[in-house]
């Protein structure tokens, strides 16, 4: 499969790497639409020491919508072809690499996949080009919740991301 590998400041390589194989507890997803995050731009321009969770040598990208392509023998809560959003913080079971889960790769292997934890179902009413923006949407929602608005109040979130 083809994958964008983050090598450091202004250095991304497109490589042919083996397609991951699904273990008993894993789910393999095929990316269908990805977007470029402000974090992607920041670490590309300024390097890995920007404070973002990025792994040099890791598969780049984290804003994506995907389809389930393979399911491990012990996994029962996903179906083949189901559209899913891989939650960057938990998709690889390594919170240090949330920005390098493989959004710009053909496939992502999600180890020990859990519904509504590492992978979230995406309703069909949301088009792919919008579904890949679930991650920045959740960031804005979290920011609004942290402001603890009360019923009837408004919350505005400003940002320069995607």
Q: Which stretches of residues belong to each language-model region?
A:
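Short cysteine clusters
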Residues: 37
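NAD(P)H dinucleotide-binding glycine-rich loop of Rossmann-like/cofactor-binding domains
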Residues: 87-158
């Amino acid at each position: 499969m083809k994958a964008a590998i983050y090598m450091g400041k202004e250095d991304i390589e497109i490589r042919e790497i083996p397609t991951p194989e699904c273990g008993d507890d894993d789910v393999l997803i095929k990316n269908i639409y990805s977007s470029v995050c402000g974090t992607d731009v920041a670490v590309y321009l300024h390097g890995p020491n920007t404070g973002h969770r990025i792994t040099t040598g890791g598969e780049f990208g984290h804003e994506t919508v995907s389809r389930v392509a393979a399911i491990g023998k012990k996994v029962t809560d996903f179906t083949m072809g189901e559209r899913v959003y891989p939650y960057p913080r938990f998709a690889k079971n390594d919170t240090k690499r949330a920005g390098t889960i493989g959004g710009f790769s053909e496939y992502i292997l999600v180890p020990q996949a859990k519904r509504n934890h590492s992978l979230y179902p995406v309703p069909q009413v949301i088009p792919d080009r919008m579904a890949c923006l679930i991650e920045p949407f959740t960031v804005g929602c979290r920011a609004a919740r942290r402001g603890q608005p009360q019923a009837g109040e408004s919350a505005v979130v400003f940002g320069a991301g995607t």
